Regions:
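Membrane-interface capping segments at transmembrane-helix boundaries
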Residues: 8, 207-218
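Hydrophobic core segments of alpha-helical transmembrane domains in multi-pass membrane transport
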Residues: 35-39, 55-60, 87-94, 116-120, ...
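Short, membrane-exposed interhelical loops at transmembrane-helix boundaries
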Residues: 168-190
Length: 218
């Protein structure tokens, strides 16, 4: 009797779990999840990148742990177990940030702790990890975390560039070009206000849906 062939770790099916959230199933611009942090942490690019990586780590490993435990956790207490797993991972991530990137950790402040309530993390556990194998769940978590992070980075790129004239804290716009120095340019202070994050996300959604007819409402 021939043995069943094992599915490759990076089969086409598994790669779809990893790459799908970048476009067709993006948690922010398709599922409209995680919008609050898009407002809070995208004034500068560095905090946005750190937040994106933090959410990716938490989503990936919470998916993995809950997939491993899925057959041993009674349905009536699954939400409590999920919250405990997510909270433990968030605390670990928070301590790592304080140890290695303390200044960015101070900028993110309470928003790292609020990853516990991020609907993307809990949503992927409920929708995917509890019904799929650990490896697929891990890839799904990475994909959704990076898909979420991609939008944060895009929003932060435009807000920091046009709002502060810098990227990653390094000045891009030359001093001589500013009005105060006799030039013609001035930073757009409106980009630093939270509503601009919503407007930029709205523009991204518009561009994305205009290029993907399957997402357009009939």
């Amino acid at each position: 009797m021939s043995k069943m062939e094992k599915e490759p770790l990076f089969s086409a099916k598994n790669l779809k779990y990893l790459t799908g959230p970048f476009s067709a199933n993006n948690p922010v611009i398709v599922q409209i999840l995680g919008i609050c942090s898009a407002l809070a942490v995208t004034v500068q690019l560095k905090p946005a990148i750190v937040m994106a990586l933090s959410v990716t780590v938490v989503t990936a490993f919470s998916n993995l742990v809950m997939s491993l435990l899925r057959n041993g956790v009674p349905s009536r207490i699954r939400i409590i177990v999920q919250l405990v797993v997510i909270a433990a991972l968030v605390i670990l991530v928070d301590q790592v940030l304080k140890a290695f990137v303390y200044e960015v950790s101070k900028q993110l402040s309470v928003y790292v702790g609020l990853i516990i309530t991020n609907c993307i993390v809990m949503g992927r556990i409920e929708a995917f990890a509890l019904a799929n194998k650990p490896w697929a769940s891990f890839l799904d978590g990475i994909g959704n975390g990076l898909g979420y992070g991609l939008i944060l980075v895009i929003v932060a790129f435009f807000r920091e560039l046009f709002g502060s004239g810098s990227l990653l804290g390094y000045r891009i716009s030359p001093e001589s070009g500013y009005m105060a120095e006799g030039g013609f340019y001035s930073n757009c202070g409106l980009m630093l206000f939270p509503p601009m994050a919503l407007i930029i996300v709205g523009c991204i959604i518009w561009v994305h849906r205009s290029r993907n007819k399957d997402l357009q409402e009939k």
